[in-house]
Curated annotation (Swiss-Prot):
Binds 1 metal ion per subunit. Binds 1 thiamine pyrophosphate per subunit. Keywords: Decarboxylase, Lyase, Magnesium, Metal-binding, Thiamine pyrophosphate. It comes from the Bacteria. GO terms for molecular function: indolepyruvate decarboxylase activity; magnesium ion binding; pyruvate decarboxylase activity; thiamine pyrophosphate binding. This is Indole-3-pyruvate decarboxylase. One of its GO terms (cellular component) is cytosol. The keyword Transport does not apply. It comes from Enterobacter cloacae. One of its GO terms (biological process) is aromatic amino acid family catabolic process to alcohol via Ehrlich pathway.
Length: 552
């Protein structure tokens, strides 16, 4: 045990309890003394980032792979830069703890006009800004620090959302008592009467259903129930699909998997399997505009049984207080009795194998990439042509597929990939990002090179903001960006650039380069030249829906 033991040590021990081995962030004068304890910690490794926005994205990517992450910024200027990323973590249910190093308690009490403040002697402005985008918050004092750290962390673990701790510089050094027990959050259990009522209602519906299908989404992943869903479809063969954020839950090459459900933009086979079912088991779903091609999904309450993290629904009746794992266990048992295999002729397995010739287009790019993906990959696809083109990829077992279509902050994936590779150094990380998106967060390439990471980064260069062009202003210069020499950037961002770069414009070139980088131990950047106006089919349907909504 470290002596003298203080609040900083207590917080670091609790981060370890939550599963974090790293702390992302940017140093600032109000958090430097806390950082001394981080550097001395045997369990937590400091990971400095190029800026706070990137650090928040990196922490998010890390948490999606490890289940929890922590981020450190400095008061005011640092924390505000990170709030975009924290808001995305909140929207998409990712538990990232935001620790903010703040001015000392005495200075705050005196209302001193300090740097990084608004000059009004008030120190809670930014705390209040964080309240809507975190599930629990605390201003730590010498008296409450240990209790509040535990409260915020247990709430985060239960709700799978971010938390916020303001840590004044002096409080970090105050004496604390080491924790006796590891931090755990108690698994909730449903009231027996409520669970029975849900079971009875679900059984009545399933018993009358001739065709039952399963539709899963990202909240299954956030609550650690991926393997439960995989086991479910093995024990009870039935048609199943995911939404975009839930890709990777299933082995997408197995029988019974139909693809990605996206409302009217779904393939005919997926629409028939899901919308044509008498009963659809919707587990961990969120029917957002970008996931449903503008709310074009055709699923009625009467047709669905819905399972959310802390409640379940049959028809129009909600049963609150039922944890997702218990609802799933109940439905698996009922499905074994009442669901019989039907409409099981899928999966097509994969996009047809390409003939690698001709200039690159959206179509032959994704077909070529399909042959490159292998079990265990971590794939991050940025908002836009990357995410919505990847929707038709058929992922093998144990692939992590990371997208951010609800929050939709372009540039997210480059920095999130840094976090993902930090969490999983021995797995292959593949980044799919547009040129416009990459310009927002490219600095984190330097951090990847510093830490000797070796992701495979594909920059889809279509000369600007293609999604925005598809929505509105196809020829307007506000959708243009500066044209960069992408293959030279890694060299500029490291004095020891252990990287290789390529620019490809032909399908055969891409196939050859992918074969070269398949087992590389260095960072690989591939600039993929694509037509300016070429977009994946789903993105075309989505942009039309968004344009109509904006004009309504």
């Amino acid at each position: 045990m470290r002596t003298p033991y203080c609040v900083a040590d207590y917080l670091l021990d609790r981060l370890t309890d939550c599963g974090a081995d790293h702390l992302f962030g940017v140093p600032g004068d109000y958090n430097l003394q806390f950082l001394d304890h981080v550097i001395d910690s045997p369990d937590i490794c400091w990971v400095g980032c190029a800026n706070e926005l990137n650090a928040s994205y990196a922490a998010d990517g890390y948490a999606r792979c490890k289940g929890f992450a922590a981020l450190l910024t400095t008061f005011g200027v640092g924390e505000l830069s990170a709030m975009n990323g924290i808001a995305g973590s909140y929207a998409e249910h990712v538990p990232v703890l935001h620790i903010v190093g703040a001015p000392g308690t005495a200075a705050q009490q005196r209302g001193e006009l300090l740097h990084h403040t608004l000059g009004d002697g008030e120190f809670r402005h930014f705390y209040h800004m964080s309240e809507p985008i975190t599930v629990a918050q605390a201003v730590l004092t010498e008296q409450n620090a240990c209790y509040e750290i535990d409260r915020v962390l247990t709430t985060m673990l239960r709700e799978r959302r971010p938390g916020y701790l303001m840590l004044p510089a002096d409080v970090a050094k105050k004496a604390a008592t080491p924790p006796v027990n590891a931090l755990t959050h108690k698994q909730a259990h449903a009231d027996s009467a409520c669970l029975k009522a849900f079971r009875d209602a679900a059984e009545n519906k399933l018993a009358m259903s001739k065709r039952t299908a399963l539709l899963a989404d990202f909240l299954v992943l956030r609550h650690g129930l991926k393997h439960a869903l995989q086991k479910w479809v093995k024990e009870v063969p039935m048609a199943h699909a995911t939404m975009l954020m839930g890709k990777g839950i299933f082995d997408e090459r197995q029988a019974g998997f139909y693809g990605t459900y996206s409302g009217s933009a779904s393939t005919g086979a997926v629409k028939e399997a899901i919308e044509g079912a008498d009963t659809v088991l919707c587990v961990g779903t969120r029917f957002t505009d970008t996931l449903t091609a503008g709310f074009t999904h055709q699923l009625t309450p009467a047709q669905t049984i819905e399972v959310q993290p802390h409640a379940a629904r049959v028809g129009d009746v909600w049963f609150t207080g039922i944890p997702m794992n218990q609802a799933i266990e109940t439905l698996v048992e009922l499905c074994k009795q009442h669901v019989h295999a039907g409409l099981m002729s899928s999966s097509s397995g994969a996009i047809p194998f390409p003939q690698p010739d001709g200039s690159l287009t959206q179509e032959n790019f994704w077909r070529t990439l399909q042959t490159f993906i292998r079990p265990g990959d971590i794939i991050l696809a940025d908002q836009g042509t990357s995410a919505f083109g990847a929707i038709d990829l058929r992922l093998p077992a144990d692939v992590n597929f990371i997208v951010q279509p609800l929050w939709g902050s372009i540039g997210y994936t480059l920095a999130a990939a840094f976090g993902a590779q930090t969490a999983c150094p021995n797995r292959r990380v593949i980044v799919l990002t547009g040129d416009g998106a990459a310009q927002l967060t490219i600095q984190e390439l330097g951090s990847m090179l510093r830490d000797k990471q070796h992701p495979i980064i594909l920059v889809l260069n279509n000369e600007g903001y293609t999604v925005e062009r598809a929505i509105h202003g196809a020829e307007q210069r506000y959708n243009d960006i500066a044209l960069w020499n992408w293959t030279h950037i890694p060299q500029a961002l490291s004095l020891d650039p252990q990287s290789e770069c390529w620019r490809v414009s032909e399908a055969e070139q891409l196939a050859d380069v992918l074969e070269k980088v398949a087992h590389h131990e260095r960072l690989s950047l591939i600039e993929v030249m694509l037509p300016k106006a070429d977009i994946p089919p789903l993105l075309g349907a989505l942009t039309k829906a968004l344009e109509a909504c904006n004009n309504a």
